[in-house]
Regions:
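Start-transfer (signal-anchor) and selected internal transmembrane alpha helices
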Residues: 1-41, 337, 341-342, 579
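Signature aromatic-anchored transmembrane alpha helix within multi-pass, membrane-resident enzymes
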Residues: 288-300, 337-362
């Protein structure tokens, strides 16, 4: 752990920042702290397509098409992640590499902050906190990495790492710049900033009044600035949050049954936060640091009320972002609370436990990627099908494509446009859910040269950066035509289904298996909701048909050539070598399309 440095020899100087620190166990300190970052870089590279989910895809499309920074609600930290990919746009890189740079740029920035505090400031505890801020409480939100508080908290840690040192007053300007970035990152950053300064304040280590005065003036100025120029989104959220006449969500807090729901949610998804909170309370009480105990516990429970007076807890990307402030509230006191020197064995155990937590959280992020990988695969399947129909603007029925992992949210049209542009601007397509097309009469008020950017926002096609995107002028076409399948039985012998199953599955599991359906006839298979067209399957063993739990998966798009999609399959309890057959059901009748795949069930 880093030592709390309070000697004149440790003042911040440029020469000191360039000098390599001499830690104990130098080889370990040169390698181990970087391992989590290597994993984060690898994940960001491998999952770059998935990291344009929701707001992330919105900002990417904005800076690519506007060819400049896109900042909303004065949250200027948003520009940090846009610097590197925007340079790529300016020099004309392919969009694949722009998306890759965008994914990596988030990790690059936090890694630079880590290097600055860990080596430049010799503060290993702050470096460890920055790693924790990139892993704890994050799974779904790894795919919306631009969330402003994910920037505000590491900057807050950097601010505190400098603040704890002795420094000449002119260094305050660096802190004030950091303070502005922190406070303008997110409204909740104001709460976290006050929390940290209150937690830090002690008579023994208090700084001269002029330091607090400078920080306080900037804080008041930031509050006034936000008050007068607050965007509609923020003002609307705050007005609703504290209007307890219209917002009655807080009433759930007087229902004893809700605390069971809240407790189970916290235990399942935030157990490390609860454990850290208990350790902090015990540590502060044992040291009789009652003011700090009041600050930590008061902030924790005040934020519990704030969250639950606006939301009902549930696992989601948005809820992860709402819950994120609990991470700095408990881990900043915990990590800084460990003594800088003492029994080496205890310090080693502490470092080992924190390292295990980081490794565990990295594993959670990796295994949580499965639904996002499937989601991207489904988008690419729909893009392929859309291209076969001709045109570039499509709608899809959410009733037939929702596979659970689909997450058919407002950014779906944006994400499909970005993903399709990887193959070339001339074959770009955008696919919107049907609900978006009919939202507030979009289908009637939209011109032929417009497209759905978000369900509540239409864009002219001339707005697009022609280097990367081109959409044809014309109406939206459906991927799920409602034309009746009158002659479908006559084309069954000209259809094939290829099953891309794994070779081994566990008995009684339920899995998604990719299949490719090939229609070699001139008659399409129409997948409209009311056409009752499904993919289903049955199992055989030595040519004997097994009893099985039939699951029907709606055909996600019309088939006029080749169409790929996933089918949900229940693995039977029988173990051994089995055969899986997939077929199409139309009005409860099997078409008898040939398909067969050998599978080992264990």
């Amino acid at each position: 752990m880093a030592r709390v440095v309070e000697t004149s020899g440790t003042r911040i100087t440029f020469r000191r920042l360039l000098r390599r620190p001499r830690y104990r166990y130098m080889i370990v300190n040169r390698i181990v702290p970087h391992l989590p970052w290597f994993v984060l870089f690898a994940l960001a590279s491998y999952l770059y397509k998935a990291r344009i989910f929701a707001d992330s895809g919105f900002y990417v499309s904005q800076f690519i098409n506007n060819q400049t920074f896109w900042i909303e609600c004065q949250r200027i930290v948003l520009g940090i992640s846009q610097i590197i990919p925007l340079i790529g746009v300016w020099i004309g890189l392919q969009i694949k590499y722009i998306l890759l740079l965008y994914s990596l740029s988030h990790v690059i920035f936090f890694y630079i902050l880590f290097l600055f505090v860990y080596y430049g400031l010799r503060d290993r505890r702050s470096g460890l906190l920055i790693i924790l801020a990139q892993t704890v409480g994050i799974m779904h939100s790894f795919y919306t990495p631009m969330f402003e508080l994910y920037y505000g908290v590491p900057l807050l840690i950097t601010f505190y790492s400098i603040w704890r040192l002795q420094f000449r007053f002119r260094t305050i300007y660096i802190l004030l710049i950091l303070e502005v970035l922190i406070l303008l990152s997110h409204p909740l950053a104001f709460m976290l900033f006050v929390f940290l300064l209150l937690y830090d304040f002690r008579k023994e280590t208090a700084k001269p009044f002029k330091y607090y005065a400078a920080v306080g003036i900037v804080f008041i100025a930031a509050v006034a600035f936000k008050y007068f120029v607050m965007c509609g989104y923020e003002s609307g959220k705050l007005a609703w949050q504290f209007n307890y006449t219209e917002n009655t969500q807080y009433l759930q807090l007087i229902n004893p049954a809700y605390y069971k729901v809240l407790g189970l949610f916290m235990l399942r998804y935030y157990s490390e936060v609860l454990i850290a909170f208990i350790l902090v309370i015990f540590m502060l009480a044992n040291r009789k640091q009652w003011f700090r105990l009041l600050v930590v516990a008061g902030t924790f429970f005040a934020y519990v009320f704030l969250v639950n007076s606006a939301y009902t807890v549930s696992p989601s990307r948005y809820m992860e972002q709402v819950m994120f402030p609990f991470v700095p509230i408990v881990f900043i006191p915990l990590i800084y609370g460990f003594p800088a020197s003492g029994r080496q064995g205890l310090l080693n155990i502490s470092v080992l436990l924190i390292s295990a937590l980081i490794a565990y959280r990295l594993a959670v992020i990796y295994y949580g990627s499965e639904i996002f990988v499937k989601r991207i695969a489904q988008m690419e399947q729909l893009i392929e099908t859309a291209r076969q129909k001709g045109g570039s603007k499509f709608v899809v029925s959410q009733d037939v494509i929702d596979h659970g992992y689909t997450q058919l949210n407002w950014s779906f049209p944006i994400e499909t446009m970005l993903l399709s542009a990887i193959d070339g601007n001339d074959i770009t397509v955008t696919i919107a859910p049907e609900d978006d097309l009919y939202f507030e009469n979009n289908n009637n008020k939209m011109a032929a040269d417009q497209f759905i950017f978000r369900r509540w926002e239409l864009k002219d096609e001339k707005w697009l950066n022609s280097r990367y995107f081109h959409l044809d002028i014309g109406p939206y076409r459906t991927l799920n035509d409602t034309t009746p399948n009158t002659n479908i039985s006559s084309i069954a012998n000209r259809m094939r289904i290829n099953i891309d199953a794994k070779k081994i599955y566990r008995a009684t599991d339920t899995v998604w298996i990719p299949v490719t359906i090939i229609n070699q006839s001139d008659i399409p298979v129409y997948s409209g909701k009311n056409n009752k067209v499904f993919l289903s399957y049955f199992w055989t063993e030595n040519k004997d048909v097994l009893n099985w739990d039939e699951i029907r998966t709606p055909l996600q798009a019309d088939i006029s050539g080749t169409m790929r999609q996933d089918i949900r399959v229940a693995i039977p309890p029988n173990k051994g070598h089995l055969q899986l057959k997939v077929d199409i059901l139309v009005n409860d009748k099997w078409l008898g399309i040939y398909s067969l795949e050998d599978v080992l069930v264990y």
